[in-house]
């Protein structure tokens, strides 16, 4: 269930960054192309996790807590991403991306507590943190 939510998060992120890259140029465009590519790679990791699901990695209280993660995504992440329209104002677009990245980090960090030995998930969390850092740096330079 939560890997499907993660797939949705990454797919929407890919589309958002792809659209931003089409509206920008130079270094800003390069960053958005890089972020889009990495979001697509994250989606591939989650697809593989779904395919290779190892139930022994999943904590016993998984079913009780999956509802919390789903609710978190529905309340915090998806309302921002449902409208995939990219704002014309680049600062608003970056600000929106920052919020989604922050919420994604929280979601994946909580997910990792139920799948504690998943290196792929930990790697994605670190990459999402780098996305956040890059976006904040970009916001400060505009």
Features from the language model and the residues they span:
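Non-heme di-metal
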Residues: 1-142
């Amino acid at each position: 269930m939560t890997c499907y939510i993660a797939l949705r998060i990454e797919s929407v992120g890919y589309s958002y960054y792809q659209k931003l890259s089409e509206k920008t140029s130079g270094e800003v465009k390069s960053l958005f192309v890089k972020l889009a590519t990495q979001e697509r790679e994250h989606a591939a990791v989650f697809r593989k996790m779904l395919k290779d699901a190892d139930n022994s990695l999943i904590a016993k209280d998984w079913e009780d807590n999956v509802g919390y993660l789903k609710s978190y995504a529905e309340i915090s992440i998806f309302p921002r991403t449902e409208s995939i329209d990219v704002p014309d104002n680049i600062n608003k677009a970056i600000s929106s991306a920052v919020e989604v990245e922050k919420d994604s980090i929280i979601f994946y960090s909580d997910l990792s507590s139920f799948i504690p030995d998943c290196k792929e998930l930990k790697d994605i969390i670190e990459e999402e943190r780098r996305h956040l850092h890059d976006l904040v740096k970009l916001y400060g330079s505009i």
